[in-house]
Amino acid sequence: MSRIGKQPISIPNGLDVSLKGSVLVFKKGNNTKELDTKGNVNIEVKDGNIIFTSKGDDRQSRAYWGTYRALANNVVVGLTTGFTKQLEINGVGYKAAAKGKVLELALGFSHPINYELPEGIEISVEKNIITIKGSDKQVVGQVAAEVRGFRPPEPYKGKGVKYAEERIIRKAGKTSKK
């Protein structure tokens, strides 16, 4: 039995949720998101809650039950508060600058890296901290992973781009034989 799927999602004020067949439609202001469940779960929208129930008792149905509940909750949280990821740049001469919809990175290569931001993502840079904001959890995480992937932190000096909460396990350098 899905412990996540059993929990109803409360609909906050200002968020309109409607059900069109097997598609949940979330609206807040001029922002609209759709979640297609492909008919794998039963959905009810009543009394300010979204309630998910499993279509069957097989393993696949129970997996969909918890998954779609979590995806719907991510849409609700994204439209109300949004998601944020922070990246930290460490290294001599490593810099970042936000220029409109492009993130310009100088990470020790012979050329600057210009990363074009996807739709719905905002970015801000303060000193060596890059803050990525957006309403879609998957896209925010994907952008953060791609930016980190340009120069992942190395274990000897810790230089590179890392998540703000990430801890780098350091290695000792070579020791000389005498």
UniProtKB/Swiss-Prot annotation:
Q: Which GO terms describe its molecular function?
A: rRNA binding; structural constituent of ribosome
What keywords are annotated for this sequence in UniProt?
A: Ribonucleoprotein, Ribosomal protein, RNA-binding, rRNA-binding
Kindly state one GO CC term assigned in the UniProt record: cytosolic large ribosomal subunit
- Xref: Pfam families: Ribosomal_L6
**Intrachain S-S bonds:** none
Q: Which GO terms describe its biological process?
A: cytoplasmic translation
Assembly notes: Part of the 50S ribosomal subunit.
Instruction: List the PANTHER family.
Output: 60S/50S RIBOSOMAL PROTEIN L6/L9, LARGE RIBOSOMAL SUBUNIT PROTEIN UL6M
The family assignment reads: Belongs to the universal ribosomal protein uL6 family.
Biological role? This protein binds to the 23S rRNA, and is important in its secondary structure. It is located near the subunit interface in the base of the L7/L12 stalk, and near the tRNA binding site of the peptidyltransferase center.
Protein name, as recorded: Large ribosomal subunit protein uL6
What is the species of this protein?
Answer: Campylobacter fetus subsp. fetus (strain 82-40)
